[in-house]
A protein has these predicted regions:
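Extracellular beta-rich repeat passengers
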Residues: 129, 134, 139-308
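Beta-strand-rich extracellular modules
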Residues: 424, 436-440, 532-536
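Extracellular calcium-associated, cysteine-rich motifs in secreted modular proteins
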Residues: 308-378, 456
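Surface-exposed or secretory-pathway low-complexity segments enriched in glycine-proline
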Residues: 380-422, 447-449
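C-terminal edge beta-strand
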Residues: 441-456, 542-545
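Right-handed parallel beta-helix
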Residues: 2-11, 26-37, 50-63, 75-97, ...
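A short beta-strand micro-motif common to beta-rich folds, especially ectodomain repeats
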Residues: 427-441, 447-449
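C-terminal outer-membrane/trafficking sorting elements
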Residues: 462-474, 478-547
Length: 547
């Protein structure tokens, strides 16, 4: 329990597990991981069965024999931005006669579960299966929030199963060459268990094989059905009520916008999106397929990984930890040196990684993991980095237009689909650039890019033993006003930077030994800051704490 798998920190093409499944336990986070099992043993791919308070984000699962994903018996879980594809169809499942087709994407279950912004592609069945949970008294208890998912080339089964309360909102189902089923949601009312089995169904789009919309999201009765199991009677309640059962705690896009957002940002795409997942995204966009099953001949539904060309090359990369993370605290040396931390902490000392230097609620380790989970680039001072934005906006195909919506510590321009970023001459450290893509249909999405400049953040360089001139700043720690004075008289340029080198306040004022400059820092969050003062050609940097 309490494990974080941060696959975004892997070198090369990232991590790919084969031949054995991955299980996530309680209070854990799994991000940016690939699981491609291949034919052989009847395994699931990625499991959250029985877990509590856990998250899976930006993972890729394919080539599984049983189910690609399962969360039976779980509580309080989230599966998001994950790509599930090419579950092996006629692959010799140990529990079925030879020749039986399977190809299941997954069973989603749990007393409270959120499943959103995922892509399911080229899976024959269980796209998804909603497997309900029953408590010790025999009462249905599951509450599932299923929204903004994209499902492509689902074969003989779309989403079906039994569930207590299901929000099924703004999903995008796109038929493919192997799709044979008409509805996208089938509730199966059981003849056992106490309580209701219901679904709130709204805003879902169904696209036909020829690209026409069978449901543009406005008909909330089209594409849904329910069935009665043997021994069950007609429900006395509304199976499909008109109001959601509970609020969602993530942004819900329209189904059309979700389609574009998901196909722009899904799966294990850091350090990079591998060749397999690039193909899956491309085929979903095109409504195409490349491979057929060697046993069934079904289009897009492969039966063995060899049908799709087998495993691509993942280079073996060896890192010398003595050079990369000398003190083994999870923060690489370059990060600690950039932000004035100690890359040579004693063994077992995690004070640097667990500290929250900028007091924003996230530890230094979390700040590093966020950087690694964001598309990022490195540029030298005085140079410009050029970034092709199309690889971050694959879903926006219709005349995309790009604009820069936020930047600090540099300038950014867009030339067609190329973003050009130039840091300020005086800046060193890390900053982020937000850009927005808008297409001809008015759909828009904002993403951010990280930029690393130099080897040390401005303001966090060690203060030399010999100061250029005396600076007095008080009170320290400070709550509202910081008073700054110097040993000489004259105009001074004052710049305040946070722990990561980002400028948060600049001021020019006249200071002297007897007249202090009054700086209002009340608006700053709690944390460590650096004050850089320049006067008469001299420069000095001091540290202060904002309470």
């Amino acid at each position: 329990e309490q494990i974080t798998i941060a696959g975004q920190t892997a070198p090369g093409k990232g991590v790919c597990f084969r031949a054995a499944p991955i299980g996530i336990n309680s209070e854990s986070v799994c991000r940016f991981l690939r699981i491609r099992l291949g034919g052989g043993t009847t395994y699931d791919g990625l499991g959250m069965a029985g877990t509590n308070h856990s998250i899976v984000d930006h993972c890729s699962v394919s080539w599984t024999i049983d189910e690609a994903f399962s969360s039976r018996g779980a509580k309080n879980l989230t599966l998001q931005r994950t790509l599930i594809s090419e579950a092996l169809n006629c692959a010799g499942h140990q529990n079925y006669p030879a020749g039986t087709e399977h190809g299941y994407a997954g069973t989603i279950s749990g007393q409270t579960g959120s499943f959103h912004h995922n892509l399911l592609a080229h899976c024959n069945g269980r796209n998804w299966s909603v497997g309900d949970a029953i408590d010790g008294s025999g009462t249905w208890v599951s509450k599932l929030d299923v929204f903004n998912n994209v499902v492509y080339n689902y074969g003989s089964r779309a989403t079906d199963g039994e569930v207590h309360k299901l929000n099924f909102v703004n999903n995008y189902y796109k038929k493919g060459a192997a799709t044979t089923v008409g509805h996208i949601l089938k509730l199966e009312i059981k003849g056992f268990g106490a309580g209701t089995e219901q679904a709130y169904y709204s805003g879902n789009i169904i696209e036909d094989k020829n690209g026409d919309l069978l449901n543009d999201g406005t008909d909330n009765q089209f594409g849904r059905i329910y069935t009665l199991d043997s021994g069950s009677s007609e429900p006395t309640y509304e199976v499909f009520p008109d109001e959601p059962f509970f609020p969602s705690y993530a942004t819900i896009h329209t189904a059309k916008d979700a389609y574009k957002s998901v196909l722009s940002d899904v799966g294990c795409n850091l350090p990079l999106l591998d060749e397999h997942d690039q193909r899956i995204v491309r085929e979903t966009l095109e409504g195409s397929y490349t491979y057929v099953g060697s046993e069934t001949g079904k289009k897009g539904l492969i039966d063995n990984e060899a049908d799709a060309g087998g495993y691509e090359n993942y280079p073996e990369i060896t890192i010398d930890l003595d050079e990369f993370d000398t003190d083994r605290d999870g923060l690489p040396n370059w990060w600690e040196e950039m932000f004035g931390l100690n890359p040579n902490s004693p063994e077992g000392d995690f004070s640097d990684s667990n500290a929250d230097d900028d007091r924003d609620g996230y530890t230094n380790l979390e700040e590093y993991l966020h950087w690694m989970a964001t598309p990022h680039y490195e540029v030298k001072t005085g140079e410009t980095v050029e970034i092709d934005l199309t690889k971050y906006t694959r879903g926006f195909e219709k005349n995309p237009v790009y604009t820069v919506t936020k930047i600090d510590n540099g300038t950014a321009t867009v030339d067609g689909n190329i973003l050009k970023i130039t840091p300020e001459e005086s800046f060193g450290g890390i900053f982020y650039v937000d850009f927005t893509v808008t297409d001809a249909e008015g759909s828009a999405c904002t993403r951010n890019i990280g930029v690393k400049v130099g080897d040390r953040a401005v303001g966090v360089e060690p203060v030399s033993d010999t100061r250029q001139f005396a600076v007095n700043a008080y009170p320290n720690p400070v709550t509202d006003y910081l008073y700054v004075s110097t040993e000489s008289t004259g105009d001074a340029k004052i710049q305040v930077m946070n722990a990561y080198g980002n400028s948060v306040l600049t001021e020019t004022c006249n200071v002297s030994p007897n007249v202090a400059c009054k700086l209002d820092v009340s608006f700053l969050p709690m944390g460590i800051y650096f004050l850089k003062i320049q006067q008469e050609g001299l420069s000095e940097t001091i540290k202060f704490i904002k309470k």
